[in-house]
Amino acid sequence: DHRCRIVWRFVESLDLEPFYETIQVTDSKAGRSSIAPEILISLWLMATLDGISSAREINRRCKTDLIYMWICGGVSVNYHTISDFRCDHVEKLNDILTSSVASLIKQGFVTLAEIGQDGMRVRAAAGSSSFRRKPTLDELHKHAKAHVEALEEERRRQDESNDDDDDPPSRTRREAAADRAAREREQRIARAIEESEKLRDKKRKDKEKVRTSTTDPDARRMKMGDGGTRPAVNVQFASDSDARVIVGVEVSGDGTDGGKLPPMLDQIEDRYGIIPERALVDSAYATQASVQQAESVGCAVVSTVPRSEQLRRHGKDPHQRQRRDNDEYEAFRKRMAEAEYQELYKKRPSVAELPNADCRNRGLTQLRIRGLTKATAVALWHALTFNLLRMVHMGAIA
């Protein structure tokens, strides 16, 4: 079987009732038929498998590629519908991830006794030059707001001059697009000012140096894998240690992984009602606050001890209690001195980094959309695609 048939069988097994609830087309009324969600979901899963992130490219393949034509089954689609569907159903995609993993738990493929978590920084759809300081943002917002008001006044005068005409001309697409672009720019700059205030409140010093992007206010400058600093978002995946299936997804504007483990444990409990017994993470996650929160809910953190080499250079044992350690962190240090847990930690790359590497290979390197909500939707499409391949490997899909 071609993998497009596997994709279709997987989609057929899903509960898509929430997608159908939003469709308002009926047989008794005139109008264009709505496109079945099975088609649009299959198109995006197939495109993600092929490393395609462009809605226009998918639309082109629906007309020229037999695989995509087979998925459409003679139904006409356009790039706008495909593009909107990618990001308009974040909650429903989250539900699909939850229900599909819950099914694997029921079948015994996934236990969630042990998870791995790792993050990757994905280039945002914003330029480095779009980051501005607060005074500049205020000035830009004033000009953008004045521009919107000027356009509204111009449209009002046009409407008044056309009142006496028997057949007044309707607003052109170009005028409507100009109005929409002006409003969206004003809204983005306003969001950038809000984000700038939040960042300034968090910083203890150099508050005046805080910059936010007018293109994507949710993007942050982050240090990337090649050593460069670029606008990006932080995509976090948590995966089951046995099945290597993604069980949790989070997207944020934080440039570090510190503090990301407790929210992921909460997410897993909310999704499946299970708290993992162990979490395999690198030392960036093993902050004292994170270890304390994880241990308090019954999850043992398995990681290298932060600053081990520095402590050894000063003649200290990193696996013994240090000044300012709490009881949970002392237990973590002593646990990681045991050979059993050091051997267990060696599994971390194959558990935590495998999903990241696979998604990178399928194009999760540069976002085409803006905002954390839409970025979460893209991350969920990649998670569902990765899990689909794992299900095929495990024999969970016939």
Task: Label each residue range with its predicted role.
Residues D1-L45, D50:
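Basic, short loop/linker segments at the boundary and entry of helix-turn-helix/winged-helix-like folds
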Residues E17-F19, T26-R32, P37, R61-G74, ...:
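Helical catalytic core of nucleic-acid polymerases
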Residues A47, I71, E250:
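Generic anion/oxyanion-binding catalytic loop in active/binding sites
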